[in-house]
Amino acid sequence: IFEYPIEGLPLGTYCMGVDSINSNESSDRINSLATAYILKRTHDPLGKFQYHIVASYAGRPKLVTEFYELCEMLADMYNAYILPEFNQSFVDHFVNQNKGYVLWDTPQLSIDIKQTAFSSKMASHKKGLNPTPTNQQFGMDLAVTYSKAPIDYIEDRKVMSRVLGVNRIYDYMLLEEMKNYKSKPSSSKGIHDGNFDRLISFYHALILANHLDKYLPMDKFISNKDKKEEPRLQTPA
C-alpha cells in the first residue's frame, strides 16, 4: 500500500485493474501471477498521489479463491470499481457475493477501443475485458502515454519542477516488467511475448480511469462513503 484510502472521496475515484489466474496449481512452464493494481484518479490537482498507483498485489496464493477474496477486500477498502481481464471464475465470485456491480460493464468501453464488431465470444459477457490484440495494444498505449507524460512535481502544494509521468510509479517490480517488456511481431492470440501480469493489471486500471474521465467526471459521482447497498450514479446534468 502506497497510500491508504481517503475517507469521503467520491465513488469512482479509485480504479482497480486485475489479471487473475485460472487454476490453483502454477504451471512449471508458465508461472503466472495473480495481480491487482489500484489507481487513484485526480480529485485535488495539488494533492498527493493524483493519478498514482495507491495499492498493488502480485503473488500466487495456494487457492485461487484467496485472490478473489483479496480483490473483494481491496475493492471494499478503497470503494473501487474493478476492470479485470476477462476471467469467468473471477466474475462469478463477485456475482455470487452480490457484488457484481463492483465490476465495471464493458460494452461501451469496448466500443471506445474501436471494437464495434463483436464476436459471439465477446458478446456473451458484460464484465471483464477480453485479452484481444486490440485491447492489449490500447492498454499498452495508455501505459506508454502515462509514463512519458510531463507532470508537475509538487511539494508543499507548490509546483517545484516538471518530471516524466513514470515517476508516479513507486512499484519497483512493475517498473522492472516495463523495462523488460517484449512484444510479438504479430499474433492473433495477443501482443505480449512473455508474462507481464503486473503491467496487464496496471493498464486495465488505466483503461478504466481513462473511460471514467470521459463519461463520468468526478463531480458527477455520488459520494459513497457510507455504502450499504449497490452504488448508483447521478445522472449528468
Where in the sequence are the language-model features?
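RNase H-like, metal-dependent nuclease domains and their acidic two-metal-ion catalytic environment used
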Residues: 1-108, 152-237
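Short alpha-helix plus adjacent loop in nuclease-associated cores
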Residues: 105-160
